[in-house]
Amino acid sequence: MKNEEYWNKRAASYDEHVITEYADANEQTVSRSLAYLKGSDEVLEIACGTGIMTLGIIDHVSHITAIDISSAMLDRLREKTEGRYTNLSLMHTDIFDHEFDDKKFDVIAAYNVLLYMENVSEVLRRIHSLLRPGGMFLSASDCVGGIDNADAAEKRRRVEKGELSFVGFFTPDELAKTIEKAGFTVLESENIHEGTPNQFIAAKRI
């Protein structure tokens, strides 16, 4: 199953699951992100999903371009935001869209998606290229490397069954080092979730 198909199927129940399992982590992700955001910021949010994080930060920035490969996830976000925001653009695409080639952003956010990207190093280099000098990269990601629990087992099962094409089993330290290798200075790296680590990372473009 392609990742887009998987996330389209998850869209209807996604909020219920994530809000239940990651309520505190979501709140911390938003509050920690706000410490790095300014009212003048142009933000690109990768894999915005149903907009849980989008809605948490949109009132604090100039504009968000929110993108996702799942049309169903974007439909859910569109339902939540229709007619409410003039500083939000939704796009059914990914970060390698050539439309972004000549654009620069103050902040790029990738919440709870890096572990599903087999080409994560390439993605991080692309993020670096789309940020203005000194721009910020904000991320939160489950880090299941070295973890032996039901969540890690379920992620392995989904890959084995072909529901997901890839899950990265990296540790928080490995993820931070991968981000640094892409040309960033990590300013903050903190686990914000009990159980499976959900690592919030704020990194500045060098």
Regions found by a protein language model. Give the residues of each.
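Short alpha-helix
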Residues: 166-182
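Short catalytic micro-motifs in class I SAM-dependent methyltransferases
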Residues: 112-113
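A short glycine-rich, Lys/Arg-flanked "PGG" loop and its adjoining helix->strand segment in the class I
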Residues: 121-133
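Class I SAM-dependent methyltransferase SAM/SAH-binding core
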Residues: 44-97
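A conserved beta-strand element that flanks and buttresses the S-adenosyl-L-methionine
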Residues: 109
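Conserved class I S-adenosyl-L-methionine
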Residues: 1-38, 138-163, 193
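Core SAM-dependent methyltransferase catalytic element
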Residues: 182-184, 188-206
